[in-house]
Design a protein with these regions (language model features):
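Internal intein/HINT superfamily modules and their associated LAGLIDADG
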Residues: 1-24, 226
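Long, C-terminal-biased catalytic regions of enzyme "large/alpha" subunits
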Residues: 1, 25-277
Length: 277
């Protein structure tokens, strides 16, 4: 990464740099409304903007400590506090959105690092098996905690009653299918960790329909490239670019070897450029 530039391309909101087509931030698929900002003597119509209240779980850390439930619920509490305290009068669109939607985005980092550490290829069926179970659990516990907050405060996000949570449709696939490990390798990774069942989802469905949900948005996978280095992690849930990444900031160059890199797992850090996509 070199110098940073900001520009606006009206048609596609994308631009070409050094032969690469680049776009704006895309981890947030969230309601955004255009406000009507008028002259000083006219009244403005303020609608909802987007505030990225983001955080990421370190997959390796929560898996090795067998604390997916605890980490997820603590993260939702922390992110919810950020949303609640982000009361910016000078940016009324953000204030309105936070007050009405309480949106947060809990994501994850270090997927490739965790897989490589456990000798699992990123493209393998074991990797897909792991992701199906892990992110189902993050979804379950983040939703459960959001329901608990709504119950504790007696408050849901605005228009909850119009949502798929309220009519129960959101839960259809979870109450009809068990999301459990299918491969022996992944079964061993989740050994000693309780995995929510169809019955747990059915119970959560009842609780959500009764008490509501506090956060209109709960999960979002952020790119967290720089923050992943601080956490000794691979970035986000994406495959690595190289076993030793090189980043340039102005006049400084940083070399970052992938976490847990050894002679034994070297070939499990397959570059994204070499993968069949």
């Amino acid at each position: 990464v070199y110098d940073t530039y900001c520009f606006t391309e009206e048609k596609r909101h994308m631009g070409m740099f050094n032969g690469m087509l680049l776009g704006n931030c895309t981890e947030i698929m969230q309601l955004s409304e255009v406000s009507d900002i008028n002259a000083y003597y006219e009244e403005d119509t303020i609608r909802r903007g987007i505030s990225c209240n983001l955080g990421s779980l370190n997959i390796a850390t929560v898996m090795e400590n067998k604390r997916i439930k605890e980490a997820t619920k603590a993260a939702i509490d922390s992110l919810t506090m950020v949303s609640d305290l982000t009361n910016i009068d000078v940016v009324p669109t953000i204030k309105k959105a936070n007050e009405e939607l309480h949106s947060v985005g809990l994501g994850a980092m270090n997927l490739h690092g965790f897989l490589a550490k456990n000798f699992i290829m990123y493209e393998s069926k074991e990797a897909l098996d792991f992701c199906n179970v892990f992110f189902m659990m993050v979804n379950f516990y983040s939703l459960e905690r959001s329901m608990e907050i709504a119950k504790e405060r007696g408050e849901t996000f605005k228009d909850f009653e119009k949502s798929e949570y309220a009519n129960g449709n959101y839960f259809n696939k979870y109450v009809t299918k068990e999301y459990i490990p299918q491969t022996e390798k992944v079964k061993s990774l989740f050994e000693g960790i309780y995995i929510p069942t169809k019955e747990d989802w059915a119970n959560l469905k009842e609780q959500v329909m009764k008490h509501g949900v506090y956060n209109a948005y709960r999960m979002a996978i952020a790119p967290n490239q720089s923050t992943s280095y601080i956490m000794n992690s691979t970035a986000s849930v994406m495959p690595v670019v190289d076993t030793i990444e090189v980043r340039e900031y102005g006049d400084s160059t940083t070399f970052y070897p992938m976490p847990y890199l050894t002679n034994d797992n070297y070939f499990f850090y397959k570059s994204a450029y070499d993968m069949d996509q």
